[in-house]
């Protein structure tokens, strides 16, 4: 008789229930290996469309495809066991209609086995969020600075810093919550606005350049590890892995060129005749 241990993975309702409780910890991951490390300490792993910047070197997230998100989402699911895995819906996969959004989100859930999707937009996407949640697809919202809107925003700048600019962002937060999202990312907004949104909506807010008062925080893994050449103001670098990785690669290259590697301990001898 075999004994099987069931490992419970966090769900969207688990995260929703954290409103006003212990802060929610979230990081991005795009690979099975990094997912296995992040999974030990985080409640949520976001397979962000930021993979376009981090993995592929795109200037924006606009070129990212649904197929890219599904491939990396599946990898992160294989590498993790405990955290809720949320996969971003890329630009062009959900905006045209509620039906398009459903088909894209259903593909993501079916092909990656993740627990939720994330999409950008507030009031304008509320109907779509409701359509998805009513059909069994958990949705994480995303308001404030929305990177997929770079071509209309003109630049990646913080939102809500001017007098009288709060109301549209507050309306977005209310719309996302009322539509049934289980949580919402609030990106790059004035700190008092991030705090106010957190205090006034019923779902958890996950800040990225918003406020310490948010119900949770998220960063891009490579940014906080010191692997990105440029980091936004809201990023704290918890490591400086870039120089260490470069030193390791340099050491390897030097030893290969000098024939110091591989050494005797790294090669195979003949088996003794028996």
Curated annotation (Swiss-Prot):
Annotated 3-methyl-2-oxobutanoate binding sites: 49-50, 88, 118
Enzymatic reactions: 3-methyl-2-oxobutanoate + (6R)-5,10-methylene-5,6,7,8-tetrahydrofolate + H2O = 2-dehydropantoate + (6S)-5,6,7,8-tetrahydrofolate
Keywords, sorted A to Z: Cytoplasm, Magnesium, Metal-binding, Pantothenate biosynthesis, Transferase
Entry's Gene Ontology BP terms: pantothenate biosynthetic process
Pfam families: Pantoate_transf
Gene Ontology CC entries for this record: cytoplasm
Pathway membership, UniProt: Cofactor biosynthesis; (R)-pantothenate biosynthesis; (R)-pantoate from 3-methyl-2-oxobutanoate: step 1/2
Native source species: Rhodopseudomonas palustris (strain HaA2)
Keyword check for Coiled coil: no
Subunit note: Homodecamer; pentamer of dimers.
Main localization, broad class: cytoplasm
Record protein name field: 3-methyl-2-oxobutanoate hydroxymethyltransferase
Residues at the catalytic site: 187
Positions contributing to Mg(2+) binding: 49, 88, 120
Subcellular location: Cytoplasm
Primary enzyme class: transferase
Coiled coil (residue ranges): none
Cofactor section: Mg(2+)
Function: Catalyzes the reversible reaction in which hydroxymethyl group from 5,10-methylenetetrahydrofolate is transferred onto alpha-ketoisovalerate to form ketopantoate.
Gene designation per UniProt: panB
């Amino acid at each position: 008789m075999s004994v099987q241990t069931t490992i419970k993975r966090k769900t969207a309702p688990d995260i929703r229930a954290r409103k006003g409780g212990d802060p929610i910890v979230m990081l991005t991951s795009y690979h099975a290996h990094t997912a296995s490390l992040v999974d030990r300490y985080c409640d949520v792993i976001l397979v962000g469309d930021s993979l376009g910047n981090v993995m592929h070197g795109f200037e924006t997230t606009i070129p990212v495809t649904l197929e890219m998100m599904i491939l990396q989402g599946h990898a992160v699911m294989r590498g993790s066991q405990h955290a809720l895995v949320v996969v971003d819906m890329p630009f062009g996969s959900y905006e045209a209609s509620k039906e398009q959004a459903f088909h894209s989100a259903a593909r993501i859930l079916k092909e990656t086995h993740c627990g939720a999707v994330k999409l950008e937009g507030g009031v304008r996407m509320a109907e779509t969020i409701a359509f998805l949640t009513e059909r069994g697809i958990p949705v994480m919202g995303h308001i404030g600075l929305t990177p997929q809107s770079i071509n209309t925003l003109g630049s990646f700048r913080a939102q809500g810093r001017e007098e009288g600019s709060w109301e549209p962002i507050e309306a977005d937060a209310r719309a996302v919550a009322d539509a049934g999202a289980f949580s919402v990312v609030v990106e790059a907004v004035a700190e008092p606005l991030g705090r106010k949104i957190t205090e006034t909506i019923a779902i958890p807010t996950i800040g990225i350049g918003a406020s310490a008062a948010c119900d949770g925080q998220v960063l891009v893994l490579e940014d906080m590890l010191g692997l990105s050449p440029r980091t936004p103001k809201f990023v704290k670098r918890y490591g400086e892995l870039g120089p260490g990785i470069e030193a390791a690669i340099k050491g390897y290259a030097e030893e290969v060129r000098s024939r110091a590697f591989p050494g005797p301990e790294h090669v195979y001898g003949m088996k003794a005749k028996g």
